[in-house]
């Protein structure tokens, strides 16, 4: 797409799923970004029973020929019924959540007594 900044942005949302929670961020939001030659729609919602595509969290990229769905459980491509393009459809499930690698890296930094060994910053 090679787009820079959108020409216009319009958003609509509010606190509809959990209106009594003490949070300021909307739990429901739809935003339309207008670029030269295409539009992009961002939908965000909390409180939908099992969520879109039978997943309780994640993100979907909807295109002309297929939809790419990603979450912490993996990814899946759902092909449009009328698409002439054949696309891969694996659901890739990770064997771990990366916690083992983070723990090993942290222990290595402690053993070396060198904080620069840590691959990510330590937040207080």
Model-predicted segments: where are they?
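Contiguous beta-strand/loop segments that form the cofactor/metal-binding neighborhood of enzyme cores
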Residues: 1-124
């Amino acid at each position: 797409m090679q787009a820079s900044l959108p020409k216009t942005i319009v958003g609509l949302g509010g606190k509809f799923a959990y209106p009594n929670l003490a949070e300021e961020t909307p739990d429901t939001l739809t935003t339309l970004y207008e670029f030269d030659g295409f539009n992009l729609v961002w939908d965000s919602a909390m409180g939908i029973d099992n969520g879109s595509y039978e997943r309780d969290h994640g993100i979907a990229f909807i295109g002309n020929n297929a939809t790419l769905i990603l979450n912490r459980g993996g990814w899946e491509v759902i092909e449009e019924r009328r698409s002439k393009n054949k696309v891969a459809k694996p659901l890739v499930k990770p064997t771990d959540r990366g916690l083992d690698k983070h723990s090993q890296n942290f222990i290595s930094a402690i053993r070396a007594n060198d904080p620069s060994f840590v691959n990510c910053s330590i937040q207080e």
